[in-house]
Regions:
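N-terminal maturation segment of proteins
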Residues: 1-258
Length: 258
């Protein structure tokens, strides 16, 4: 917020902040002149580069530079494109990869009806995918969560503006289950070919196992059982998507593509 971080007395800064919070619309209207027409990132501020690098380290827990992370991203995009090309050939699609993307995004076979009934079908099929993987978890993991996992549609009061599919933790003692929430206000935004991977990412063996087992640890300080690092949590989610394939999931090649 422009103008708040200054050399002023802390009590005066607090007073300025309280005024701005009491009249947020007025503040934002007056602050428009400090906003560039084109977003240019943190580097335009004093100390911006240092701040950006600190955030990179916070999210990645590494000393990788922005250029190194960008190059890693390009390498991964190339690898994933090659995998997707193989699936395109497997299903016999006659066209390039971009045309295949368009086909999957527009063909009605990949979508449930945009109705409450269609949303319930999405929930039930997600439960089936998780039931399939849950049967195989003991063969791959020596420790399983105490808390059960349930699948729910995001509640109507927060569905319109809420986040996409996400996970909400249960309790460490297992008395309340973890919840995989599916955001289904617009079924055209939730294609069938992506739902299996999302179920494994958010549920098992993904965030439900990752967060639940961490919460249950009694050999570390409690604050460490609640700490979260994006590179680990989302890395585990992506690993879980791949592990599910090794466990026999994605029998439909379109789900593998998703």
């Amino acid at each position: 917020m422009h103008g708040l971080v200054t050399g002023q007395d802390p009590r005066r800064r607090r007073g300025d902040l309280e005024v701005k919070l009491e009249n947020p619309i007025g503040f934002f209207e007056s602050d428009i002149e400090n906003t560039p027409e084109v977003a240019t990132g943190m580097h335009r501020f004093d100390g911006g580069i240092e701040f950006y690098n600190a955030m990179l380290k916070n999210y990645t827990t590494t000393d990788m530079t922005a250029d190194e992370i960008h190059q890693l991203g390009l390498t991964e995009v190339e690898r994933l494109n090659n995998e997707m090309l193989k699936i395109k050939e497997q299903v016999g699609f006659d066209g390039d990869l971009q045309e295949f993307f368009t086909f999957i995004r527009t063909d009605e076979q990949f979508f449930y009806p945009d109705t409450d009934e269609g949303a319930q079908m999405y929930i039930e099929d997600s439960k089936k995918y998780l039931a399939f993987i849950n049967e195989r978890l003991p063969d791959y993991f020596g420790i399983l969560p105490k808390a059960d996992l349930v699948v729910k549609r995001v509640e109507s009061f927060r569905e319109q503006d809420g986040a996409a599919q996400h996970y909400y933790p249960g309790t460490p003692d297992g008395s309340r289950p973890g919840i995989y929430y599916a955001h289904l206000s617009d079924m055209t935004a939730m294609p069938k070919n992506e739902m299996e991977a999302i179920a494994y990412h958010e549920g098992n063996p993904g965030h439900h196992m990752q967060i639940s087992i961490a919460q249950e640890l009694d050999s570390v300080p409690e604050f460490r059982t609640q700490a979260g690092f994006t590179v680990y949590s989302e890395g585990w989610g992506l690993y879980s998507e791949q592990l599910a394939k090794e466990m026999g999931a994605y029998q439909n090649p379109y789900s593998d593509f998703g």
